[in-house]
Amino acid sequence: MTNYPITYRLIKKEKHTGARLGEIITPHGTFPTPMFMPVGTQATVKTQSPEELKEIGSGIILSNTYHLWLRPGDELIARAGGLHKFMNWDQAILTDSGGFQVYSLADSRNITEEGVTFKNHLNGSKMFLSPEKAISIQNNLGSDIMMSFDECPQFYQPYDYVKKSIERTSRWAERGLKAHRRPHDQGLFGIVQGAGFEDLRRQSAADLVGMDFPGYSIGGLAVGESHAEMNAVLDFTTPLLPENKPRYLMGVGAPDSLIDGVIRGVDMFDCVLPTRIARNGTCMTSEGRLVVKNAKFAEDFTPLDHNCDCYTCQHYTRAYLRHLLKADETFGMRLTSYHNLYFLVNLMKQVRQAIMDDNLLEFRQDFLERYGYNSSSRNF
């Protein structure tokens, strides 16, 4: 049996769905699953300190290979002792491969078998990223969980294009495995692609499972498709992945999508959504989204969320938060970001309890009704 640096332990399956309760053991600690991972693109979760993230209960955070490669540079971070030491974070870190950022640069990139040529968004210089380079950068960063370099095709691209793309991504995954110099302390995940095509998802998963990665990511979702389309892809993709390894749905952070992903057997999620919307004054609460900058909250001296026990809700009012954000004060962004991250990490805690109690579907229904989703449009 292969000795992986990342291992998944299944604790319990929910009786009525594909949801599973477990934990993932990494070189920098163990965290429970299902789990939402805050995103620290530039080696920091925007406005939050490592101590605050630990208070929130984030046992793992995500950082971005592409951005750290460009600035300050992966070799500098290696000289600093690795990403954990550089950013003073002693728990687990996951790094993406840079593939999604390159996907986002559609107008300035060129994809070949060797890799991707694109323009540096900081200074316009020409850059080249290959599977080997993506692995080398992540080896220098020293993250606990790494991602294979992949192409993320658009969800509605033609079948023939997506087929060629997933076949190239499989070849890139094999090249990345061979280039990986730290398999003893960094777990490399394969990324299943295939847009909305079931047979291509099946082909991609079969290729990658055959390479025996310690975990698997589901990519190419949350890129413009509908909620129903995402659920349909998860319905036929997640069962293709090994039960004894972690499953990670990339780029998903809307509460309903988190719950529906868990129902389909996903263990890990990440998204910039909670911090991005928080900085603009949009807060997630147990009764739906609340835009605290709105004028009606100017004299509202109640907490953001009466059902939340986070630091922000225990100490500050909607009126004060509105004042800070209207005045462009960083402290306001810190407080709303803290709350939104706490909300999603705590939502996953509630989901784990619902799995333990075998009542996840009832929890989902109750949550959707309170949050304000039209549950009839969120069928699964």
Swiss-Prot record:
Keyword Transcription: no
GO molecular function: metal ion binding; tRNA-guanosine(34) queuine transglycosylase activity
Highest taxon of the lineage: Bacteria
Annotated substrate binding sites: D96, S97, G98, G99, F100, D150, Q193, G220
Keyword set, alphabetical order: Glycosyltransferase, Metal-binding, Queuosine biosynthesis, Transferase, tRNA processing, Zinc
InterPro entries registered for this protein in UniProt: ArchSynthase1/Queuine_TRR, TGT, TGT-like_sf, tRNA_ribo_trans-like
One Pfam assignment: TGT
Keyword Zinc: yes
Protein name: Queuine tRNA-ribosyltransferase
Organism from which the protein derives: Streptococcus equi subsp. zooepidemicus (strain H70)
